[in-house]
């Protein structure tokens, strides 16, 4: 009986130690966007449009920080890779003349076109939410458009 008790206690201790090391990272990582460096969106030499693709996943945009040039058109391809959860893309700043709100259904792709005229840093986010649960923005689905 003593050997079984020791093995059982050792097993429980091992599980608790593993959870104390890996558990917080697993829980924290569930709702946070992956760390991706800012994307400098290139200007197409043929038509002058700045094009980028943003992947919408479970509560994240990738990339979540884009750098564009003021006064040049921007075209964003918003691609949802979720199978059930719909998302949206909101980029609103009245002073900068930005008012974009597009729904992106699960597994769908939509295109957003605009021309940012005023340099600055502008947040974009998803405001979808289910009942009393936190919104997608509250779960980390937000990003930054940096206009230079």
Locate the predicted segments by residue:
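Extracytoplasmic entry segments of secretory-pathway proteins
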Residues: 1-53
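Extracellular/periplasmic metallocenter environments
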Residues: 34-46, 104-148
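N-terminal edge beta-strand
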Residues: 43-73
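Exposed beta-strand and adjacent loop surfaces of beta-rich binding modules
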Residues: 51, 73, 84-88, 121
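Soluble periplasmic/extracytoplasmic beta-strand elements of cell-envelope proteins
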Residues: 53-55, 75-77, 90, 125, ...
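Non-cytosolic beta-sheet module surface loops
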Residues: 56-58, 78-82, 116
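Beta-strand-rich interaction surfaces with strong enrichment in secreted/lumenal proteins
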Residues: 63-66, 98-103, 112-113
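Histidine- and aromatic-enriched segments that form or immediately flank copper-ligand environments
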Residues: 79-106, 132-143
